[in-house]
Amino acid sequence: MRQAFADAQAALPFVVAQGRNIETAIYEARYPEYSYRDLMPVVTEGNQWAIGTQFYSMQLAGEAKFLSGAANDMPFNNVSWGEGSHDYAMIGSGWEWNLEEVNQASLYGRNLNDLKAMSASRSTERLLYDIATTGSTEKNWRGFVNQSNVQTITAAATGTGSSTLFANKTPQQILIDLNGLLKLVPQSSNNVELADTLALPLEVMDYIATVFVGTEANSPTILERFRTSNVYTARTGRPLSITTADSLSRAGAGGGGRIVAYRKALDVIRFHLPMPRMVLPVHQKTIMGFETGIIARTGGVEVRLPGAMAYMDGVSEPA
Protein backbone atom coordinates (compact mmCIF):
# COMPACT_ATOMS: atom_id res chain seq x y z
CA MET A 1 0.00 0.00 0.00
CA ARG A 2 1.23 3.48 -0.84
CA GLN A 3 2.31 5.59 2.12
CA ALA A 4 -0.05 8.51 2.74
CA PHE A 5 1.29 12.04 2.62
CA ALA A 6 1.26 13.60 6.08
CA ASP A 7 1.12 17.18 4.89
CA ALA A 8 1.20 19.35 1.78
CA GLN A 9 4.97 19.68 1.87
CA ALA A 10 5.40 15.91 1.61
CA ALA A 11 2.83 15.72 -1.20
CA LEU A 12 4.30 18.58 -3.23
CA PRO A 13 6.53 16.43 -5.55
CA PHE A 14 3.53 14.23 -6.43
CA VAL A 15 1.32 17.26 -7.12
CA VAL A 16 3.99 18.92 -9.26
CA ALA A 17 4.38 15.77 -11.36
CA GLN A 18 0.62 15.47 -11.77
CA GLY A 19 0.43 19.14 -12.66
CA ARG A 20 2.75 18.61 -15.60
CA ASN A 21 0.31 16.08 -17.09
CA ILE A 22 -2.58 18.49 -16.67
CA GLU A 23 -0.52 21.35 -18.09
CA THR A 24 0.06 19.33 -21.26
CA ALA A 25 -3.67 18.65 -21.59
CA ILE A 26 -4.43 22.36 -21.18
CA TYR A 27 -2.00 23.43 -23.88
CA GLU A 28 -3.38 20.78 -26.23
CA ALA A 29 -7.02 21.75 -25.60
CA ARG A 30 -8.83 23.51 -28.43
CA TYR A 31 -12.15 25.33 -28.18
CA PRO A 32 -13.69 25.73 -31.64
CA GLU A 33 -16.71 27.51 -30.15
CA TYR A 34 -14.39 30.33 -29.03
CA SER A 35 -12.59 30.71 -32.34
CA TYR A 36 -11.62 34.37 -32.33
CA ARG A 37 -8.71 33.36 -34.57
CA ASP A 38 -11.24 32.66 -37.33
CA LEU A 39 -12.52 36.23 -37.15
CA MET A 40 -9.30 38.23 -37.23
CA PRO A 41 -5.50 37.94 -37.20
CA VAL A 42 -4.06 37.30 -33.73
CA VAL A 43 -0.77 38.99 -32.86
CA THR A 44 1.39 37.11 -30.34
CA GLU A 45 4.68 38.87 -31.11
CA GLY A 46 6.59 41.02 -28.65
CA ASN A 47 7.49 40.56 -25.00
CA GLN A 48 4.66 38.88 -23.12
CA TRP A 49 5.21 41.14 -20.08
CA ALA A 50 5.31 44.42 -22.00
CA ILE A 51 3.07 47.26 -20.84
CA GLY A 52 1.69 47.61 -24.33
CA THR A 53 2.61 48.16 -27.93
CA GLN A 54 3.44 51.28 -29.86
CA PHE A 55 2.82 51.44 -33.58
CA TYR A 56 3.37 53.79 -36.45
CA SER A 57 1.17 54.32 -39.47
CA MET A 58 1.97 56.14 -42.66
CA GLN A 59 0.02 57.76 -45.44
CA LEU A 60 1.54 58.27 -48.87
CA ALA A 61 0.61 61.18 -51.10
CA GLY A 62 1.95 62.04 -54.52
CA GLU A 63 1.40 61.95 -58.25
CA ALA A 64 3.23 61.70 -61.55
CA LYS A 65 2.68 63.92 -64.57
CA PHE A 66 4.10 64.80 -67.97
CA LEU A 67 7.22 67.00 -67.93
CA SER A 68 9.22 68.92 -70.47
CA GLY A 69 12.98 68.60 -70.68
CA ALA A 70 13.43 71.99 -69.00
CA ALA A 71 10.74 71.56 -66.38
CA ASN A 72 11.16 72.90 -62.84
CA ASP A 73 7.83 71.70 -61.47
CA MET A 74 8.65 68.07 -60.68
CA PRO A 75 5.88 66.63 -58.41
CA PHE A 76 7.38 65.17 -55.24
CA ASN A 77 5.88 62.44 -53.08
CA ASN A 78 5.25 62.98 -49.38
CA VAL A 79 4.93 60.61 -46.45
CA SER A 80 2.94 61.58 -43.34
CA TRP A 81 3.43 59.54 -40.18
CA GLY A 82 1.06 58.78 -37.33
CA GLU A 83 1.79 57.23 -33.96
CA GLY A 84 -0.39 55.29 -31.55
CA SER A 85 -0.22 52.89 -28.62
CA HIS A 86 -2.24 50.01 -27.20
CA ASP A 87 -2.04 48.82 -23.58
CA TYR A 88 -2.12 45.22 -22.37
CA ALA A 89 -3.93 43.69 -19.40
CA MET A 90 -3.76 40.31 -17.65
CA ILE A 91 -6.58 37.82 -17.07
CA GLY A 92 -6.53 34.56 -15.16
CA SER A 93 -8.43 31.65 -13.65
CA GLY A 94 -7.19 29.20 -11.02
CA TRP A 95 -7.95 25.99 -9.16
CA GLU A 96 -6.98 24.20 -5.95
CA TRP A 97 -6.30 20.70 -4.63
CA ASN A 98 -6.43 19.70 -1.00
CA LEU A 99 -4.48 17.04 0.86
CA GLU A 100 -7.43 14.65 0.80
CA GLU A 101 -7.69 14.72 -3.01
CA VAL A 102 -3.95 14.24 -3.38
CA ASN A 103 -3.78 11.26 -1.01
CA GLN A 104 -6.76 9.55 -2.65
CA ALA A 105 -5.20 9.94 -6.09
CA SER A 106 -1.91 8.53 -4.82
CA LEU A 107 -3.58 5.69 -2.90
CA TYR A 108 -5.50 4.36 -5.90
CA GLY A 109 -2.79 5.08 -8.44
CA ARG A 110 -4.81 7.53 -10.49
CA ASN A 111 -4.18 11.01 -11.80
CA LEU A 112 -5.37 14.08 -9.98
CA ASN A 113 -8.79 15.21 -11.16
CA ASP A 114 -8.28 17.69 -14.00
CA LEU A 115 -11.89 18.89 -14.25
CA LYS A 116 -11.20 22.10 -12.34
CA ALA A 117 -8.10 22.76 -14.42
CA MET A 118 -9.90 22.24 -17.72
CA SER A 119 -12.75 24.44 -16.49
CA ALA A 120 -10.24 27.21 -15.74
CA SER A 121 -8.73 26.75 -19.18
CA ARG A 122 -12.14 27.02 -20.84
CA SER A 123 -13.06 30.06 -18.73
CA THR A 124 -9.87 31.83 -19.78
CA GLU A 125 -10.45 31.09 -23.44
CA ARG A 126 -14.08 32.18 -23.15
CA LEU A 127 -13.04 35.53 -21.68
CA LEU A 128 -10.49 36.02 -24.47
CA TYR A 129 -13.26 35.30 -26.99
CA ASP A 130 -15.60 37.79 -25.31
CA ILE A 131 -12.89 40.47 -25.31
CA ALA A 132 -12.12 39.78 -28.97
CA THR A 133 -15.76 39.93 -30.08
CA THR A 134 -17.46 42.47 -27.81
CA GLY A 135 -14.61 44.13 -25.92
CA SER A 136 -14.52 44.99 -22.22
CA THR A 137 -16.48 47.72 -20.44
CA GLU A 138 -14.05 47.50 -17.52
CA LYS A 139 -11.11 48.37 -19.80
CA ASN A 140 -13.17 50.60 -22.12
CA TRP A 141 -12.26 48.35 -25.06
CA ARG A 142 -14.46 47.66 -28.05
CA GLY A 143 -14.46 44.37 -29.91
CA PHE A 144 -14.92 43.02 -33.39
CA VAL A 145 -18.69 43.57 -33.48
CA ASN A 146 -19.06 47.06 -31.98
CA GLN A 147 -16.35 49.41 -33.22
CA SER A 148 -17.62 53.00 -33.05
CA ASN A 149 -15.67 54.26 -36.08
CA VAL A 150 -16.83 51.55 -38.51
CA GLN A 151 -19.52 52.65 -40.97
CA THR A 152 -22.95 51.14 -40.28
CA ILE A 153 -25.98 50.78 -42.52
CA THR A 154 -29.38 49.15 -42.08
CA ALA A 155 -30.62 46.44 -44.39
CA ALA A 156 -33.07 47.67 -47.01
CA ALA A 157 -36.73 47.69 -45.93
CA THR A 158 -37.78 45.57 -48.89
CA GLY A 159 -39.23 42.57 -47.06
CA THR A 160 -42.84 41.76 -46.33
CA GLY A 161 -44.47 44.76 -44.68
CA SER A 162 -41.32 46.85 -45.34
CA SER A 163 -39.33 44.56 -43.07
CA THR A 164 -35.52 44.59 -43.00
CA LEU A 165 -35.32 41.06 -41.57
CA PHE A 166 -33.87 38.39 -43.85
CA ALA A 167 -36.55 35.94 -42.70
CA ASN A 168 -39.15 38.20 -44.33
CA LYS A 169 -37.33 38.62 -47.64
CA THR A 170 -37.02 36.72 -50.87
CA PRO A 171 -33.69 35.06 -51.70
CA GLN A 172 -33.10 37.71 -54.37
CA GLN A 173 -33.60 40.54 -51.86
CA ILE A 174 -31.18 38.90 -49.44
CA LEU A 175 -28.53 38.51 -52.14
CA ILE A 176 -28.92 42.20 -53.02
CA ASP A 177 -28.46 43.17 -49.36
CA LEU A 178 -25.34 41.03 -48.91
CA ASN A 179 -23.71 42.33 -52.06
CA GLY A 180 -24.70 45.87 -51.13
CA LEU A 181 -22.74 45.54 -47.89
CA LEU A 182 -19.73 44.13 -49.74
CA LYS A 183 -19.84 47.04 -52.19
CA LEU A 184 -19.97 49.59 -49.39
CA VAL A 185 -16.31 49.06 -48.47
CA PRO A 186 -14.82 49.90 -51.91
CA GLN A 187 -17.39 52.65 -52.49
CA SER A 188 -16.47 54.47 -49.29
CA SER A 189 -12.71 54.06 -49.84
CA ASN A 190 -12.54 55.20 -53.46
CA ASN A 191 -11.98 51.55 -54.48
CA VAL A 192 -8.82 51.30 -52.37
CA GLU A 193 -10.28 48.65 -50.04
CA LEU A 194 -12.15 45.45 -50.87
CA ALA A 195 -13.86 43.27 -48.25
CA ASP A 196 -12.78 39.64 -48.54
CA THR A 197 -14.63 38.28 -45.49
CA LEU A 198 -18.21 38.31 -44.26
CA ALA A 199 -19.16 37.44 -40.66
CA LEU A 200 -22.79 36.52 -40.04
CA PRO A 201 -25.02 35.98 -37.00
CA LEU A 202 -25.62 32.27 -36.44
CA GLU A 203 -29.33 32.50 -37.24
CA VAL A 204 -28.64 34.31 -40.52
CA MET A 205 -26.08 31.68 -41.54
CA ASP A 206 -28.54 28.91 -40.68
CA TYR A 207 -31.28 30.60 -42.69
CA ILE A 208 -29.35 31.24 -45.89
CA ALA A 209 -27.74 27.79 -45.68
CA THR A 210 -31.11 26.00 -45.65
CA VAL A 211 -33.42 28.16 -47.79
CA PHE A 212 -33.32 27.47 -51.52
CA VAL A 213 -33.22 30.16 -54.17
CA GLY A 214 -35.83 28.43 -56.33
CA THR A 215 -38.26 25.54 -56.27
CA GLU A 216 -36.42 23.33 -58.74
CA ALA A 217 -34.94 20.05 -57.50
CA ASN A 218 -31.39 21.21 -58.18
CA SER A 219 -31.87 24.77 -56.90
CA PRO A 220 -28.96 26.06 -54.79
CA THR A 221 -29.41 27.51 -51.32
CA ILE A 222 -29.00 31.25 -50.81
CA LEU A 223 -25.56 30.59 -49.33
CA GLU A 224 -24.45 28.45 -52.25
CA ARG A 225 -25.61 31.07 -54.74
CA PHE A 226 -23.95 33.87 -52.79
CA ARG A 227 -20.60 32.05 -52.69
CA THR A 228 -20.47 32.10 -56.49
CA SER A 229 -22.37 35.33 -57.14
CA ASN A 230 -20.79 38.02 -55.00
CA VAL A 231 -18.93 41.17 -55.97
CA TYR A 232 -15.65 40.12 -54.31
CA THR A 233 -15.41 36.85 -56.24
CA ALA A 234 -16.54 38.57 -59.43
CA ARG A 235 -13.79 41.19 -59.14
CA THR A 236 -10.93 38.99 -57.95
CA GLY A 237 -11.76 35.43 -58.96
CA ARG A 238 -11.08 34.37 -55.37
CA PRO A 239 -13.61 32.82 -52.97
CA LEU A 240 -15.23 35.04 -50.37
CA SER A 241 -14.60 33.89 -46.79
CA ILE A 242 -17.86 33.52 -44.85
CA THR A 243 -17.84 32.87 -41.10
CA THR A 244 -20.05 33.31 -38.03
CA ALA A 245 -19.91 34.77 -34.52
CA ASP A 246 -22.61 34.24 -31.91
CA SER A 247 -22.17 37.77 -30.54
CA LEU A 248 -23.32 39.18 -33.90
CA SER A 249 -26.83 37.92 -33.08
CA ARG A 250 -27.26 40.83 -30.61
CA ALA A 251 -24.68 43.38 -31.76
CA GLY A 252 -26.95 45.47 -33.99
CA ALA A 253 -29.20 48.40 -33.16
CA GLY A 254 -31.86 47.38 -30.65
CA GLY A 255 -30.05 44.14 -29.88
CA GLY A 256 -30.74 42.62 -33.30
CA GLY A 257 -28.41 40.90 -35.72
CA ARG A 258 -25.41 42.54 -37.37
CA ILE A 259 -23.32 41.45 -40.37
CA VAL A 260 -19.68 42.50 -40.77
CA ALA A 261 -17.91 42.90 -44.10
CA TYR A 262 -14.17 43.48 -43.87
CA ARG A 263 -10.74 42.78 -45.23
CA LYS A 264 -9.19 40.23 -42.90
CA ALA A 265 -5.62 41.45 -42.64
CA LEU A 266 -3.19 42.67 -39.97
CA ASP A 267 -3.16 46.22 -41.28
CA VAL A 268 -6.96 46.38 -40.86
CA ILE A 269 -7.78 44.56 -37.63
CA ARG A 270 -5.85 42.55 -35.05
CA PHE A 271 -6.33 40.93 -31.67
CA HIS A 272 -3.39 41.55 -29.35
CA LEU A 273 -2.43 38.40 -27.42
CA PRO A 274 1.23 38.77 -26.34
CA MET A 275 0.73 35.97 -23.80
CA PRO A 276 -1.60 33.12 -24.77
CA ARG A 277 -2.68 30.76 -21.99
CA MET A 278 0.19 30.12 -19.57
CA VAL A 279 -0.05 27.55 -16.76
CA LEU A 280 1.58 28.73 -13.53
CA PRO A 281 3.73 26.44 -11.34
CA VAL A 282 1.97 24.60 -8.52
CA HIS A 283 2.16 26.55 -5.27
CA GLN A 284 1.75 25.16 -1.75
CA LYS A 285 -0.95 27.42 -0.35
CA THR A 286 -1.43 26.01 3.16
CA ILE A 287 -0.33 22.97 5.15
CA MET A 288 -3.20 21.07 3.49
CA GLY A 289 -3.63 22.66 0.10
CA PHE A 290 -2.15 23.62 -3.26
CA GLU A 291 -3.13 26.17 -5.86
CA THR A 292 -2.22 27.03 -9.41
CA GLY A 293 -3.82 28.77 -12.34
CA ILE A 294 -3.77 29.99 -15.90
CA ILE A 295 -2.96 33.52 -16.98
CA ALA A 296 -3.00 35.33 -20.30
CA ARG A 297 -2.27 38.90 -21.38
CA THR A 298 -4.18 40.73 -24.07
CA GLY A 299 -4.61 44.19 -25.47
CA GLY A 300 -7.98 43.53 -27.05
CA VAL A 301 -8.96 44.39 -30.60
CA GLU A 302 -7.31 47.17 -32.56
CA VAL A 303 -8.82 48.44 -35.80
CA ARG A 304 -6.25 50.42 -37.77
CA LEU A 305 -8.22 50.84 -41.01
CA PRO A 306 -11.91 51.27 -40.12
CA GLY A 307 -12.62 52.14 -43.75
CA ALA A 308 -11.91 48.50 -44.65
CA MET A 309 -14.87 47.39 -42.53
CA ALA A 310 -18.65 47.89 -42.64
CA TYR A 311 -21.62 46.82 -40.51
CA MET A 312 -25.19 46.01 -41.60
CA ASP A 313 -27.93 45.99 -38.95
CA GLY A 314 -31.56 44.93 -38.99
CA VAL A 315 -30.97 41.50 -40.53
CA SER A 316 -32.43 39.39 -37.71
CA GLU A 317 -34.57 39.87 -34.62
CA PRO A 318 -33.02 40.44 -31.18
CA ALA A 319 -31.62 37.18 -29.82
What is each PLM-predicted segment?
Residues 43-48, 56-61, 191-194, 199-213, ...:
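Short, flexible beta-strand-to-coil junctions
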Residues 124, 128-131, 178-189, 226-230:
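Hydrophobic, Leu/Ile/Phe/Ala-enriched alpha-helical segments that form helix-helix packing faces
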Residues 15-93:
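Assembly/oligomerization interface modules of large self-assembling protein complexes
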Residues 1-39, 46-47, 210-319:
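Sequence/fold signature of self-assembling virion shell proteins
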Residues 98-100, 200-203, 305:
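Helix N-cap / beta->alpha transition motif
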Residues 93-95, 292:
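Oligomerization/assembly interface segments of phage tail-like spikes and tubes
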Residues 96-176:
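Alpha-helical scaffold segments that mediate packing/assembly in large oligomeric complexes
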